[in-house]
A protein has these predicted regions:
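Class I SAM-dependent methyltransferase SAM-binding "motif I" and its flanking Rossmann-like core
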Residues: 140-185
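Glycine-rich N-terminal segment of FAD-binding domains in flavoprotein oxidoreductases
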Residues: 26-52
């Protein structure tokens, strides 16, 4: 795993956006795996800025997102489709038909997982997968204890993840969905390049465990030690325990 140090969140975002930009420029019809949450917001903002300056063209890019809450329609302001539309899709020239997320309204779990796996396989896999890492080491919604060999599946969210996400639901834990569709570790590991972004002291232990700890389902991010082309871009606080 290659580690790129950033001074702060803004620097982390710019460095991560540089790597994504290089992928888009080198292969205009690439498949980007995208992530949601607070960490990549700045990365998307930087990509939008470069697009507005004429430096990037997303017209041939296809995207597949890591995950989506089960039970939320895409129009819900806390759905991950809504997040992606607000932060990236509506602000660049990407073809909406080439943006893919799990369908949170499809409650037929087996059918939805098969559909999403089929999309990724038909695309020939993912060229670059962007990831955040949770305080408990989760990547996507692959929580501690998840088997490494899974593809897209439905997962019960860990209490720590529900707690972390309630800030997006007016602090009301009862409103936070308890399940999500997520790409599995197997799918993530099959991406040709993986880019992990992390910032802040709250992520320091997870980063330490993912980078230097044993490879174990107890810290899902630790599997990335075995990926042949994984880059971690993190600020000083997130790297403070290394």
């Amino acid at each position: 795993m290659k580690i790129i140090r950033a001074k702060d969140y803004q620097d982390m975002s710019r460095k991560a956006a540089n790597i994504i930009s290089a992928q888009v420029i080198m292969k205009p019809n690439c498949v980007l795996g995208l992530a949601t949450g607070g960490t990549p917001v700045g990365t998307y903002a930087q990509l939008v800025d470069w697009y507005n300056k004429g430096d990037l063209d997303f017209s041939e890019v296809t995207t597949v997102n890591l995950d989506e809450y089960r039970g939320l329609p895409k129009e819900h302001p806390q759905s991950y489709w809504y997040f992606m539309n607000e932060n990236l899709f509506s602000k660049v020239n990407i073809d909406p038909a080439k943006t893919n997320l799990p369908d949170g309204t499809n409650l037929d779990t087996a059918a939805e997982c098969a559909r999403y796996n089929g999309i990724i396989h038909k695309l020939g896999g993912i060229d670059l997968q962007l990831l955040g890492i949770g305080p408990n080491g989760h990547i996507g919604f692959n929580e501690p204890g998840e088997a490494f060999e899974l593809e897209t599946h439905c997962i019960d969210l860990a209490p720590t993840t529900i707690e972390a996400n309630k800030r997006f639901f007016d602090g009301n834990e009862a409103l936070v969905p308890k399940q999500a569709y997520t790409m599995g570790i197997k799918t993530i590991m099959q991406a040709r390049k993986v880019l992990v972004v992390a910032n802040g002291k709250a992520k320091a232990q997870a980063v330490k465990d993912a980078v230097t700890g044993p490879v174990t389902p107890a810290c899902p991010g630790s599997i990335l030690q075995l990926h042949p082309d994984c880059i971690l871009v993190a600020d000083e606080e997130a790297l403070s325990l290394l």
